[in-house]
Curated annotation (Swiss-Prot):
Annotated site (Proton sensing): 155, 165, 269
Protein name per UniProt: G-prodeshotein coupled receptor 4
A GO term for molecular function: G protein-coupled receptor activity
Species of provenance: Homo sapiens (Human)
Extracellular loop 2 (ECL2) as annotated region, ranges: 157-172
Keyword Ribosomal protein attributed: no
Phenotype upon changing residue 145 to Q: Mimics the protonation state; induces a shift of the optimal pH for activation
Mechanisms controlling activity: Activated by a network of residues that connects an extracellular-facing cavity to Glu-145, a conserved charged residue buried in the transmembrane core of the receptor. Protonation likely drives conformational changes in extracellular loop 2 (ECL2), which stabilizes movement of transmembrane 3 (TM3) and a series of rearrangements that connect the extracellular-facing cavity to Glu-145, a residue only conserved in proton-sensing G-protein coupled receptors.
Residue intervals on the Cytoplasmic side: 46-49, 122-129, 211-214, 290-362
Primary role: Proton-sensing G-protein coupled receptor activated by extracellular pH, which is required to monitor pH changes and generate adaptive reactions. Activated by an optimal pH of 6.8-7.2. Ligand binding causes a conformation change that triggers signaling via guanine nucleotide-binding proteins (G proteins) and modulates the activity of downstream effectors, such as adenylate cyclase. GPR4 is mainly coupled to G(s) G proteins and mediates activation of adenylate cyclase activity. May also couple with G(q) and G(12)/G(13) G proteins.
UniProt effect for mutating residue 170 to A: Decreased proton-induced G-protein coupled receptor signaling
Lineage top rank: taxon: Eukaryota
Length: 362
């Protein structure tokens, strides 16, 4: 399928050709290593039969797929919204780019609901908080979002304007079927999950306030996690969906009115770029879940940097590089307290092995 030339709205792609690619480059530099680290930490949680790790692992996979598309979008914006990589790549990378928004929102919603069930109904809904259930829910999320956002794969998504710019996944004004699909995305893909997250947060607050056995620090940690999930969706995705809803509603009312499209063109591109910050915010969830997670991640990164800078990488490779996930930190600290009473003093060559009694860990 070739490019289609159309007499569309007069949008100046030169006004915002620096901000989106600059933000995307930042997301690549920060989001790629942190999501790789988050993926590894989530995998460790799955190994410990923790259902939360399944959702976090899927969230990291979605973010990494999204980050892999960003270099082409950097090139697209630096060329003033001119796609030079052909229609096939436009469809594939555009599909991944836009679908990731709703996959990320869905998994953030899953995490929020899972935390609500864990805090408010730990025994009643225990079966819903198993790894098998989380895998099934994740499969449904992927299948639903991929199917719901697959319509662009069956339409031409390259459009050449009067200035010989080839737009990918963009048309000003939009087409009718795109406007209706955008309404579905706004209400079902964005507002519905966000409403569930707000209800989950409200339920978590009620359960935490009514709990006598939960420590104050633990209550603060639970509230912080639930609030951070809502904040990520609000900050990263709300501006984009406000403009998306406005553009779609105005098009359905006045299909060939280009005035609004031309006024919000730059703001729309900026809001779309802001959605990429989700890939940076998601790994921060680990630090918000547990106070010790920040030091654990920093320690792992420090050891990794030492490994890369070391003259003896093999020695560093043999070193133990561990990272306590938020849900295992307490378990590991208890194990250390039990085993910390005894420690072996490393013997010199030819010496007898001596055992040294150490005081219990505090």
């Amino acid at each position: 399928m070739g490019n289609h030339t159309w007499e569309g709205c007069h949008v100046d792609s030169r006004v915002d050709h620096l901000f989106p690619p600059s933000l995307y480059i930042f997301v690549i530099g920060v989001g790629l290593p942190t999501n790789c680290l988050a993926l590894w930490a989530a995998y460790r949680q799955v190994q410990q039969r923790n259902e939360l790790g399944v959702y976090l692992m899927n969230l990291s996979i979605a973010d990494l797929l999204y980050i892999c598309t960003l270099p082409l979008w950097v090139d697209y914006f630096l060329h003033h919204d001119n796609w030079i990589h052909g229609p096939g790549s436009c469809k594939l990378f555009g599909f991944i780019f836009y679908t990731n928004i709703y996959i990320s929102i869905a998994f953030l919603c899953c995490i929020s609901v899972d935390r609500y069930l864990a805090v408010a109904h730990p025994l009643r809904f225990a079966r819903l908080r198993r790894v098998k259930t989380a895998v099934a829910v994740s499969s449904v999320v992927w299948a639903t979002e991929l199917g719901a956002n697959s319509a662009p794969l069956f339409h031409d998504e390259l459009f050449r304007d009067r200035y010989n710019h080839t737009f990918c996944f963009e048309k000003f004004p939009m087409e009718g079927w795109v406007a209706w699909m955008n309404l579905y995305r706004v209400f079902v893909g964005f507002l519905f999950p966000w409403a569930l997250m707000l209800l989950s947060y409200r339920g978590i607050l009620r359960a935490v306030r009514g709990s006598v056995s939960t420590e104050r620090q633990e209550k603060a940690k639970i509230k912080r996690l639930a609030l951070s999930l809502i904040a990520i969706v609000l900050v990263c995705f709300a501006p984009y969906h406000v403009l998306l809803l406005s553009r779609s509603a105005i098009y359905l009312g006045r299909p060939w009115d280009c005035g609004f499209e031309e006024r919000v063109f730059s703001a729309y591109h900026s809001s779309l770029a802001f959605t990429s910050l989700n890939c940076v915010a998601d790994p921060i969830l680990y630090c918000l879940v547990n106070e010790g997670a920040r030091s654990d991640v920093a320690k792992a990164l420090h050891n990794l940097l030492r490994f890369l800078a070391s003259d003896k990488p093999q020695e560093m490779a043999n070193a133990s590089l561990t990272l306590e996930t938020p849900l295992t930190s307490k378990r590991n600290s208890t194990a250390k307290a039990m085993t910390g009473s005894w420690a072996a003093t490393p013997p010199s060559q030819g010496d007898q092995v001596q055992l040294k009694m150490l005081p219990p860990a505090q």
